[in-house]
Amino acid sequence: SREIIKTNVDKETGDAVRKLELPGVKVDEDYKRYYPYGSLASKVLGFTGGDNQGVIGLEVQYDAYLKGTNGKILTMTDARGVEMENGAEDRIEPVAGNDLRISLDMEIQQYAEQLAYQTLEKKNAKKVSIIVMNPQNGEIYAMVNVPEFDLNDPFTPDQNLRSESLRNQAAERDKTVKQQELLNAMWRNTCINDTYEPGSTFKIITAAAGLEEGVVKLTDPFSCPGFRVVEDRRIRCHKAGGHGAEDFTKALENSCNPALMEMGLRMGVDRFYQCFSDYGLLSLTGIDIPGEAGTIMHKLDKIGA
């Protein structure tokens, strides 16, 4: 019978065992995925595990498409498992996996990662994410989540992440940090797995919906006193004292809260919410990377006028 003593040893270890020439001990070679660009787009591409199976990212999404089928040699053996000298033999040829062509542009990805790391250092941030997309067809040209990790060494936790986790869990009884939790945090694609409040970028949606629904024109006047009262809340504009008189274009340029709130109110809840649906804000994008988070939009019955 055959017993596997250890798998996934490095070449140096395998060569050392061979030199010992131990009776009955055989070293089999296997293939391992190598990533020539190291950490580039690590959380998008993903990596393979010890058995060359996809673990995260595109590697796991397209695992069955990429991995192919191993070949086999079938031979006849005696009761002791010894191959018979003149026994029949049947060979099953291996089938190579498929190639996968994706929309990422390496130069754009590298440049975006460079900018992200500069921002990470300048702002002393914990992480920075960037997406570069073709607005006409949704193709992703770059998806950055820094700090990225080395795809050729994916099971070594980032030291900064390790230190942060130790500080966060200092109150725990045993003060230990699970290795898998650290790795999951390091591998997390925040562009896909997390949700964010869009903030003032959502004003583009409000303005476009207002124009589409015909409740506002480019020349419509607005007045910004610096705030607007909604129910029991006073929602302020970012400019103290307000922007004063402004038209639609200027209000959008100024990112004026009261003016954009007025546009939303003119549409009413039902029409405004329908625009959310029409723009695809209530559904997933369907990107072919595992773990896309759902919407954080409120339900229709939870929105007031």
Predicted regions and their residues:
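Extracytoplasmic/secreted envelope proteins and their assembly/folding machinery
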Residues: 14, 18, 41-45, 55, ...
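Extracellular/periplasmic catalytic domains that process cell-envelope and extracellular macromolecules
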Residues: 35-38, 93-94, 123-124, 134-135, ...
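Small/polar-residue-rich segments within soluble enzyme cores
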Residues: 1-97
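Short, small/polar residue-rich loop motifs at catalytic or cofactor-binding pockets
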Residues: 70, 124-127, 196
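Beta-lactam-recognizing serine transpeptidase/beta-lactamase-like catalytic domain environment
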Residues: 78-88, 104, 136-201, 205-305
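Short, glycine-anchored, charge-dense loop/turn motifs used at functional sites
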Residues: 112, 130-141
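Conserved, well-ordered alpha-helix/loop/beta-strand core segments that scaffold catalytic motifs
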Residues: 2, 85-128
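Short N-terminal helix-loop-first-beta-strand/juxtamembrane motif that initiates sensory/input modules
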Residues: 23-27, 121-135
